[in-house]
């Protein structure tokens, strides 16, 4: 959000940009960054709450779906909660976007959804399939859904780089295998990928 919002405001100058999340502290911090910008609105809510989604989506044309339980150990430990957010939350958003006439929706996914080996990856794969199938679920509504799968986003919350930076003072960085490679993109590249999806999406 901290990267997507200013880049989108600068490039597209939308009439209204709504940040919808359940974390009031993060919203409070973002409000200070965009104080005085009437284009930016903040709504507390949860994708699990369908009624709140309907209210939040009133008059909205484009949606970026980034809500997820995404810390792998947390997803394994609180598995029911992970499913409620990542799967049921996706279903709620699909229904609400269709009913409210949203034009285009891009759901952010992960490389962990490809041949998943943990619950987080499995729920994101399920979410991806739901969004793709949403295109055949729209009926007469002119709503399109697409999914983009990120690699590791450098500097994002939960990525390996902030983790390494937090422990580098100890002088030892844990590497699973010295042959291991990770696909990385920058935060800015992640935003541009979403823009590209909005511009070129055919649904899927």
Locations of regions flagged by a protein language model:
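Conserved residues in the N-terminal Rossmann fold of short-chain dehydrogenase/reductase
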Residues: 21, 43-44, 84
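Adenine-nucleotide cofactor-binding loop residues
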Residues: 25, 48, 181
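Conserved Rossmann-fold NAD(P)-dependent oxidoreductase catalytic core, especially the SDR/UDP-sugar
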Residues: 65, 69-129, 133
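Conserved Rossmann-fold cofactor-binding substructure of NAD(P)-dependent oxidoreductases
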Residues: 35, 41-62
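NAD(P)-dependent short-chain dehydrogenase/reductase
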Residues: 119-120, 125-202
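Canonical Rossmann dinucleotide-binding motif of NAD(H)/NADP(H)-dependent dehydrogenases/reductases
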Residues: 1-13
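Conserved glycine-rich Rossmann-like NAD(P)H-binding loop of the short-chain dehydrogenase/reductase
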Residues: 13-28
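Hydrophobic/aromatic anchor residues within beta-strands of the central parallel beta-sheet
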Residues: 42, 82, 105, 145-148
